[in-house]
Amino acid sequence: MTETVAFGSAETALGRLLVAATETGVAMVTWRDAPGTRARAQSRLGLPVVDDPARLAEPLLQLKAFFGGDPHAFTVPIDWRLTNPLQRQVLGTLFHRVPWGETITYGGLGDRSEAGVNAQAIGQVMGSNPIPLIVPCHRVVASNGIGGYSGGSGIEVKRWLLTMEGALPATLDWSLEEGPTPV
């Protein structure tokens, strides 16, 4: 049987997210859903596209709950095919061992994952995470501050996500219904 990928999207305070799921699990989450984005995702995955709403029902439901402020752990299966062994080790540790509302430093994640690499290498793994939000790279921070973020519109998205999870205090203009204003 030929492997396939199905696409679905979720409206969130951060915009319309695209989710790609194979028979194995969620393989990719991107920060926008557009025809070009889907084509690039399909090319990257190298799989034919099918229409399979049932495959996407649980991942989309869990993403909507997440953006509703529900402090749950994602329980959807993950398809790690777009990661190398180091990424899989580090991102797998992050997925299973850094829950809602907690943060960990880049160096701390390197230690916890027993990856044997420095904080800078962990930062590179976070920047290449094909499944942001579900594999919560926004929870990884610098030892001297919030650190960087390559998802969405950048650092303001990371700050918004950490505030939603209670890891950062809310500012007077913070809103669960409205994401950060793009810079």
Each model region followed by its residue ranges:
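Short glycine/serine-rich loop segments
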Residues: 117-160
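Basic nucleic-acid-binding alpha-helical/helix-turn surface characteristic of O6-alkylguanine DNA
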Residues: 1-116, 165-183
